UniProtKB/Swiss-Prot annotation:
Cofactor: binding comment: Binds 1 FMN per subunit.
SUPFAM superfamilies with a match to the protein in the record: FMN-linked oxidoreductases
Entry EC number(s): 1.3.5.2
Gene3D superfamilies: Aldolase class I
Cofactor: FMN
Gene: pyrD
Broad EC category: oxidoreductase
Subunit structure: Monomer.
This protein's name: Dihydroorotate dehydrogenase (quinone)
Subcellular location: Cell membrane
């Protein structure tokens, strides 16, 4: 009930202003009696992924809490994990405003944020300051002004700094809003990046006597051959997980709607089927060797079950969470428990 009222107010506001207000409000109310306004108790439905045991299979996807400011509030809502970021080595403002658009009739969102964040050092402070023991994944990327050829250096810097504070690390090479970033998904650039990240992971594991899994987040706009090549690279470099998928550049199902022609990545309900299709294709290529976290257009428990059926071991929500509220977490967990 509270969420429906809050949503009605926020949907009258500019989307990015509403986002900042939401994160700020959650930060202020976390670990206080006011969590009763959005908190809920969800019975455990444990799932093992990447050598970790999560209390339930529903996580918050990266992009909602980029700087890790409201982790404890999302824990109160019942998320099994929170993925913060995308974070870059240095703070950056992201792309010009406006850069976030609702497509309400389609339950979709278009964003061209451009990895706006306060930098990895700020994120680490917030990870240290959190009071709950929720599993936190850290999604890492490269700064906009770092040449693609040197992109791997940015990922290694972020890995070094977040390693001790992350349950797992997600490598984002699939955002459409950083020029040239998606080129890292192909050929030699992909293999060089994954190899460098794996080497760094093993060095850090030896140094800290702690193994932190790494997962690769991929785009939905890939051919079957490209998915096969990514799967082979993941297996070759012994990655621990794959996250499928990021936002899409396609506009299927939204043509004619207000804001549909805005540039950027499309998420939400219009992405549902494409994301599930990519998960299924990726699962066939990985043959059970590497687990998949399914994300993209989950707007209901049925959407989540389709991701599990396609081959995902765990799921994440973001746009669906904005449109449906915290009740979506409980609905998915309950459906998973009955599955």
């Amino acid at each position: 009930m509270f969420y429906k009222i809050a949503q009605k107010v926020m949907f009258q506001m500019d989307p990015e202003r509403a986002h900042h207000l939401a994160i700020g409000s959650l930060k202020m109310t976390a670990n206080s009696p006011l969590t009763c306004l959005y908190g809920q108790t969800i019975a455990p439905a444990p799932v093992s992924v990447m050598g970790l045991t999560f209390p339930n299979p529903v996580g918050l996807a990266a992009g909602m809490d980029k700087d890790g400011e409201s982790i404890d509030a999302f824990h109160a809502m019942g998320f099994g994990h929170v993925e913060v970021g995308t974070v870059t080595p240095r703070p950056q403002p992201g792309n010009d405003l406006p850069r976030l658009f609702r497509l309400k009739p389609a339950k979709g969102i278009i964003n061209r944020m451009g990895f706006n964040n306060k930098g990895v050092d700020n994120l680490v402070k917030n990870l240290i300051a959190k009071k709950t023991d929720i599993m936190v994944g850290v999604n890492i990327g490269k700064n906009k002004d770092t040449p693609v050829e040197q992109g791997k250096d940015d990922y290694l810097i972020c890995m070094d700094k977040v390693y001790l504070h992350a349950a797992y690390i997600a490598v984002n090479i699939s955002s459409p809003n950083t020029p040239g970033l998606r080129s890292l998904q192909y050929g030699d650039l992909l293999d060089e990046l994954l190899s460098a990240i794996k080497t760094k992971q093993l060095e850090l594991a030896e140094k800290h006597k702690k193994y932190v899994p790494i997962a690769l987040k991929i785009a939905p706009d890939l051919t079957i051959e490209e998915i096969e090549n990514i799967a082979q690279a993941l297996i070759k470099n012994k990655f621990d997980g794959a996250i499928a998928t990021n936002t899409t550049l396609t506009r299927d199902g939204v043509s004619g709607l207000a804001n549909a022609n805005e540039s950027g990545g499309l998420s939400g309900k219009p992405l549902t089927e494409l994301s599930t299709k990519v998960i299924k294709q990726l699962a066939m290529c990985l043959k059970g060797q590497i687990p998949i976290i399914g994300v993209g257009g989950i707007n209901s428990a049925e959407d989540a079950l389709a991701k599990f059926d396609a081959g995902a071991t765990m799921v994440q929500i973001y746009s669906g969470f904005i449109y449906q509220g915290p009740k979506l977490i409980k609905e998915i967990v309950n459906a998973y428990r009955l599955k």
